[in-house]
């Protein structure tokens, strides 16, 4: 067994050492190994080992409170890496990851934001492997954050919002638009709301955000009136706040809301109408009117204030006015 081990090592070093150095290497190995018994260990198949470690990581993240949607994204991202590289996660190196990310971006024409999202997931996974002593050092440490272009994302104008309200085909759609526009809640939070969750007296409701974190959101008087009109018009007994228009009137899904908004946007010639744009619009409006960023962070349910800053785009006209006020 010792001879086989030395032969394997020397074969790997052939392209790096000359004959004299190879001879010296053999002598050193013979002296070093003479005091030891060498036996071959039966190794686990690398694929099974990787799958096992990925499953443990996902379980750890589930305990930490990550949503099933996030866990699925983690799983598919890491699985894709392992399949592409063809190595056990224990043996993946920094250069493997750099090559993978470069090829992924080239093949799929992915944005820098997408590539950095993948990098962050891999960083979380390999850092966990390091913390749990499955590997010595995370190979992602030397792969830095991918710099993305800072594009100003569009928000709805006041005219856009009024157009959508005036052209809503039914009371439900009108109430949904007002709730999204005045609360800034995520569409995934809105579809989970029940009738009993709404406090009309205080114009507020409790939603469960990412990681099942509970917070209060608030709606304006217009949203209150339109929501009451919608609920009064319903003939079903489904506890869900928003339901499908057709019987049996089941709880509406995220895809259903996205479809209705997309259809309305095309009809009214309003670009990129989707639920998240309402959230960004509210954040920008709040900042423009002077809401402290810490309060906006709480309203939107962001864990990190950096995320809130990415949502809120200050209008250029306000920047110009501030320049005149403070600088001259």
Where in this protein do the model-derived segments appear?
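C-terminal catalytic core of tyrosine-transesterase DNA break-rejoin enzymes
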Residues: 178, 182, 279-302
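Catalytic-site neighborhood detector that most strongly recognizes the C-terminal catalytic loop/helix
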Residues: 43-44, 155, 210-211, 300, ...
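Short, charged phosphate-coordinating catalytic segments
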Residues: 180-202
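DNA/chromatin major-groove-contacting recognition/catalytic segments
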Residues: 28-32, 217-218, 313-328
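Basic, Lys/Arg- and aromatic-enriched nucleic-acid-binding interface segment
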Residues: 135, 147-151, 158-187, 211-213
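C-terminal catalytic core of Y-nucleophile DNA break-rejoin enzymes
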Residues: 209-229, 240-260
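N-terminal core-binding DNA-recognition domain of tyrosine recombinases/integrases
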Residues: 34-44, 51, 55-152
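N-terminal helical hairpins
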Residues: 1-45
């Amino acid at each position: 067994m010792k001879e086989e081990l030395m032969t394997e090592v020397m074969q790997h070093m052939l392209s790096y050492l000359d004959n004299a150095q190879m001879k010296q290497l053999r002598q050193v190995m013979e002296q070093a190994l003479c005091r030891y018994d060498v036996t071959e260990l039966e190794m686990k198949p690398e694929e099974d080992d990787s799958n096992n470690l990925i499953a443990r990581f996902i379980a750890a993240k589930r305990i930490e409170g990550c949503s099933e949607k996030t866990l699925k994204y983690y799983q598919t991202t890491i699985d894709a890496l392992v399949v592409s590289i063809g190595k056990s996660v224990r043996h993946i190196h920094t250069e493997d990851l750099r090559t993978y990310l470069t090829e992924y971006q080239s093949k799929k024409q992915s944005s820098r934001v997408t590539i950095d999202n993948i990098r962050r997931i891999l960083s979380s996974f390999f850092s966990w492997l390091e913390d749990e002593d499955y590997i010595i050092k995370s190979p992602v440490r030397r792969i830095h954050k991918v710099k993305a272009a800072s594009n100003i994302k569009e928000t709805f104008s006041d005219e856009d919002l009024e157009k959508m309200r005036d052209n809503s085909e039914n009371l439900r759609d009108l109430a949904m638009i007002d709730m999204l526009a005045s609360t800034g809640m995520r569409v995934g939070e809105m579809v989970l709301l029940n009738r009993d969750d709404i406090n009309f007296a205080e114009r507020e409701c409790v939603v469960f955000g990412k990681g099942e974190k509970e917070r209060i959101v608030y709606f304006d008087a217009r949203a209150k009136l339109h929501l009451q009109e919608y609920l009064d018009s319903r003939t079903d007994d489904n506890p869900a706040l928003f339901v499908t228009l057709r019987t049996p009137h089941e709880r509406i899904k995220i895809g259903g809301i996205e479809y209705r908004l997309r259809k309305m946007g095309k009809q009214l010639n309003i670009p990129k109408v989707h639920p998240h744009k309402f959230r960004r619009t509210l954040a920008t409006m709040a900042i423009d009117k002077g809401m402290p960023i810490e309060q906006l962070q709480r309203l939107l349910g962001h864990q990190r204030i950096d995320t809130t800053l990415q949502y809120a785009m200050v209008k250029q006209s306000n920047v110009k006015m501030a320049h005149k006020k403070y600088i001259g």
